[in-house]
Each structure stands twice: as structure tokens, then as C-alpha cells.
């Protein structure tokens, strides 16, 4: 029997395996940020250990950074301490740091791919749950905890169980105005918040070949929201074209050798998957979440489901609590719901293609007088490219705030957050209670849907927006 892509990557990285032990995998890339790394570095110092492979370790500042200024003192005392400690830790241990004033600084899951730090066939870890984003390149990437960060820093290895595998085959025809964000939200709505638990997901099928690398990253980024450990997409010509001539990509003969290996990274036709799921994208409409986890999602033209429609009592109780928290009612439409803020950004939707779509949507319009809207590019490279194309001017003329790169309003770890009771149309990946601030109400949407909501001051069907 053949092997799946996940099996190939896992087996290729085993460096130690006993009959009764969990295998130890070699880690090709270790990505760091300021929030989950301080304790790991402190543990290294206490044990008088060094970073085993600093040249395979990269750090950035993203979670806590201010997006209105480059002045680190404006980030708050706790955030400033974490940022200062990351600077010292990287200097002491010889690690490359993309700090606030570095020309490549950005969100870790935006920066690493665009720099060519992420490459097919690699194992990649980061102390962040959305590390699966890098799986769009055919890399086995997953989030780890602080104790595991210490272990990887010290040994460049990690003990890792072999998870089950799930194949999601995408077919059909993508309708106009439908994006990768709509597709993945619809999949999560179908499979459920825990439907991928204990599995590594591989997205495949004819639809994948039509998607850009940025769209593929959106799919893999949100696979975690169906409970998956990681997500994968086999590399192809689109992948190679994206990576060629990137800062850290191989060059010359090394590039040719890499291509030979990358072209072996696919699931064999007779590979075994523990679960298989076929999904026709033809019927996917613009999606918007109504509840407090990403699986509580509907098409914009559908009513919020009634509690009676939930057969599972646990799901029914979750829905009831979500409706109370979100201050919504069953059998009503989100197109009648006004919003307070709009956030276009995060490691899900802050890349140049996302900003182009949002800018195209709002061009010639102005945001609603009662709405605050911010755009936060995922990196300085994205920001520079957007400004080169004049997208920043379109946003500013429409009343949006054009910010500096960072995680921003995706999570309440910095100055960008919602006030209690405020409602936000957000291009981020999580809508949990309090995710964007205490008492915040988050609705996940695509960049186009978020942009249109900013103009209308409420949720609208992007297909009818003019």
C-alpha cells in the first residue's frame, strides 16, 4: 500500500524510534514570537544549555506589537517586557530576529512563507496554534507548547505521536465572489468544530489546483478550527513559482535538487486515510459566523438556525449560550444586524491578495458613520506592496485606518480590541467569547464581506453589493 503525504513527511523525519516509545522527529524550522518563548529561553539558561541550531530558528514580533506606531513603549508594560526579552534572547542565543524596525517584520505565519523560510517537505513548529498555515506548502507544521519550545531549542527534535489522517477532496465550480475563506468556513460548518480532532488533514482535488498559495494558506490556517492537528496540501507548480527567488529559498543547483525532492511530495493513489470527506464547492455562498466557534456559521442569505434544529444536546446547549452571548435570536437574518467595527487582517487574511479584494470592494465608497474600520497588513512586505499599488490610499479615502503590521485585533493581546458589547466583522480565524476583548462579539467573514460591512454598517451579501 502507498503512503499519504503525511506519512511520507512523518517517516522522513524520524530520528529515533523504539518499539514502545513515541518516535522523535527532527525539526527543520523553529519559528518564535514574543508571547510563548520567554519561559523556554529562561529554562535554557537555568540548565546552561545552548540553542542547538540557531540557523534554523527564526523569531518575529507580532502578537503584542502596536499597529499605530513603531515605538515599543506604546505597547504596554507587559508587552514591552516580552518584546524586550525576545530581543535579548535572540541576541544572546544567535537567533535571527525580525524586530519592530526590521524591514521584513510581520506576523509569523505571513513572514515565514513570503521569505522562503517555509519550504515543502519540512517539519515546522511554532508556539502558536495556527502553525498549520505552512502546510499549504507541503510542510508538516504544527503548534507546540512552551516546554516543547524549550526542547526544540535545545535538541532540534520533538517527540511526536503519529496522528490519524483525513482527506478532504474539493471539487465543483467556485462561484463569483466566493473565496477560500468562505470555502473553509463552509467545510468547518459541515464537519464541525471537533470533526478533525486527532487528525492531520490533507486538502486535495481539482479545486486546489485553482487556488493561489495565499488562498491555500487560508484553508490550512483554519483547519485547526475543525479540531485538526495540522493540514497539508501537496506542492505543485503554483508552489514552486511562489517560492522561486524568495530570500531564504534555495538557488542554483540547490533549487534544482530541491525541486526533484518536492515533486515526490504527494499522496500515493492507494494511500490509506482514516477519514475521507468529499466537498462540492459549487453551492458555497458567502459565509458569516453567528456564534462563538467557527462551526456556528451560515450563508449570509440563511436565517440563524433554531435551537430545535440541533439534534445533539451538547450542540444545542452551545448554540443557546452562543445566541445569548452574541445577543442574537434564532430565525433572524444577520443582514439586519449592525456592526461597530471591522477588522481586516490576521494570519488568515492579511496578505496582498486579501487587501486587493477588500480595496476593490470599497473603492468609491465610504465607511458608515457609526463604524470604525482598520486594515492591518500581515507584514512590512505586504504593506509596502499595497502602498506601491495605491491600496492604502483607497482604504484611507474610504475612512479605513491604515495600520502597521501585527496580529492586532485578532486577539486581545495588544491595544487593538473591542469594547464590551461591541460587534465586529473580522477576517480573523476565531470567534470565541472574549477573543477580541472582554464581552466582544466576533463574526468571521472574508475580506470582501468585511469591507462591504464597513461601508453598509451592517452585514450585506457581497454578491448584491455595489
From Swiss-Prot:
Q: Catalytic activity annotated for this protein? A: (2R,3S)-3-isopropylmalate = (2S)-2-isopropylmalate
> Does the record bear DNA-binding in its keywords?
no
Disulphide bonds annotated for this chain are none
GO MF annotation, one? 3-isopropylmalate dehydratase activity
Query: What keywords does the record list, in alphabetical order?
Result: 4Fe-4S, Amino-acid biosynthesis, Branched-chain amino acid biosynthesis, Iron, Iron-sulfur, Leucine biosynthesis, Lyase, Metal-binding
Q: Which domain of life is it from?
A: Bacteria
* Cofactor binding note from Swiss-Prot or TrEMBL: Binds 1 [4Fe-4S] cluster per subunit.
Q: Which cofactors does this protein require? A: [4Fe-4S] cluster
Which enzyme type, at the first EC level? Answer: lyase
Q: What does the UniProt function comment say about this protein? A: Catalyzes the isomerization between 2-isopropylmalate and 3-isopropylmalate, via the formation of 2-isopropylmaleate.
Which PANTHER family does the annotation name? 3-ISOPROPYLMALATE DEHYDRATASE, HOMOACONITASE, MITOCHONDRIAL-RELATED
Q: Which NCBIfam families match?
A: leuC, PRK05478.1, PRK12466.1
In Swiss-Prot or TrEMBL terms, this protein is called 3-isopropylmalate dehydratase large subunit
Give the source species.
Answer: Blochmanniella pennsylvanica (strain BPEN)
| Gene behind this protein | leuC
